[in-house]
Amino acid sequence: MTLDPSPRSTRRQRLHAAATAVVLACSAGAFAPASAAPVAPAAQPTAVTTATTAATPYCGIRWGSLPETRSGYSSATIHNVRAGRHACFDRMVIDLKGQVRGYDVRYAPVYREGSGAFVPLLGAADLRITVTAPAYDQDGRATYTPRSPNRLVDVTGYRTFRQIALAGSFEGQTTFGLGVRARLPFRTFVLPQSGGVSRLVIDVAHRW
């Protein structure tokens, strides 16, 4: 025998069915792809080329501390040695009567020409300067006779120079010792003749 459901029971079933439908609809919406405006793709990082640049050199100086040499002999003779202070470096100048041809400037121990005796210098580094020109003329007479061979120039108060010494002149070449505060960058160049005199210039920077 089939019993008809009561109105209250039927209404409860309808409400339950409606609630179930709403839940299913919401669930379906949660998993369905959104039809809203498309999401803009994430911004890609802009490629930036970073160049590795060295620190700005002191006073723009790009010298080094390796030997600087030039070959050649001449009849020029050495007549004087001078020194001066500049904003970024100390300068040594060798005056020659005639054209400078060859030289060798490097950080190395200094020895006397002829005897080979070691020449001690003030400072933490020794710069040896050899010029292929004598300090005497063709008759063997000295063209450069400093009062104190071990102190050619008073460099008191210089930031880099500590001592300039004459190590001798023998067999057509002359050697000088330049004592400096530390092994610092330097440059060597020749100034053209003026009044028959050329100049060999050695600049040593105050720091790296």
Annotate the PLM regions:
Residues 1-39:
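Secretory targeting and sorting signals
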Residues 28-56:
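C-terminal region of N-terminal signal peptides and the immediate post-cleavage residues
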Residues 49-208:
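Signal-peptide-cleaved, periplasmic/extracellular N-terminal interaction regions immediately downstream
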